[in-house]
Regions:
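Metallo-beta-lactamase
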Residues: 1-12, 16
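A short acidic, glycine/proline-enriched capping/turn motif at secondary-structure boundaries
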Residues: 9-10, 22-25, 135
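Short glycine/proline-enriched coil/turn segments at helix->beta-strand junctions
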Residues: 12-13, 85-87, 124
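Active-site-proximal loop/helix segment associated with metal-binding centers of metalloenzymes
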Residues: 17-106
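Active-site neighborhood of phospho(di)ester-bond hydrolases with catalytic His/Asp-centered motifs
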Residues: 2-6, 90-94, 120-136, 153-157
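Binuclear metal-dependent phosphoesterase catalytic core
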Residues: 10-12, 114-122, 136-182
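Metal-dependent catalytic neighborhoods of phosphoester/phosphodiester hydrolases
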Residues: 1, 27-28, 102-104, 137-147
Length: 182
């Protein structure tokens, strides 16, 4: 098992490239939160920001100033290692792209990353895998979409059981399954 965050790991004929940062959200824990781009508007927050440390928590007195000093999602994505062959690349990007129905929060509100959308359009990988907005497939009815030639998957999480996507990269066929949990 390897930590894929910010790395490129070959697996047979494929290259997996990981990205674990997400566009800022209104919740307190900010370990992996970033502004999407320079134009990003910070959402109304539920309490002050905190970072988790080995020995406890660190309060962030001014989250907006702190966040503006960090690289944006757009900048961090641009710094990822490039694949040898985009047609054999699988990006595992925690936050979903905007505009594909893979980013729909409770109440039907889209919260995806425009920077991720632009990155996928530019990088043109074979496949992207996403998470973060667990309820999205249940809210939007969409768990798989396309952005140009790229297949984008967000399996989500179902109250009915464990949600998995089984796929064949050679054939580019995928099946979403909800497995009952006893």
């Amino acid at each position: 098992m390897e930590n894929l965050a910010g790395r490129k790991i070959p697996a047979g004929r494929w290259e997996f490239i990981g990205f674990n940062l997400v566009t800022d959200f209104p919740f307190r824990l900010k370990d992996r939160a970033r502004l999407d781009s320079g134009e990003f508007t910070i959402p109304e927050q539920f309490g002050g920001g905190i970072l988790s440390l080995t020995g406890g928590w660190e309060e962030i007195p001014d989250w907006a100033a702190y966040a503006r000093a960090l690289p944006t999602i757009e900048e961090e994505l641009a710094a990822l290692p490039a694949p040898v062959d985009p047609g054999r690349a699988v990006y595992v990007i925690h936050g979903p792209p905007a505009g594909l129905g893979l980013d729909v929060a409770r109440g039907g509100r889209p919260v995806g990353s425009p920077a991720t959308t632009r990155f996928v359009e530019s990088a043109r990988p074979l496949l992207t895998l996403h998470g973060h907005i667990h309820e999205s497939p249940e809210e939007s009815g969409v768990w798989m979409s396309r952005l140009g030639r790229t297949v984008c998957i967000q399996p989500g999480q179902s109250a009915a059981g464990l949600t998995v996507v089984v796929g064949d990269l050679e054939k580019m066929t995928f099946d979403r399954r909800v497995l009952p949990v006893d």
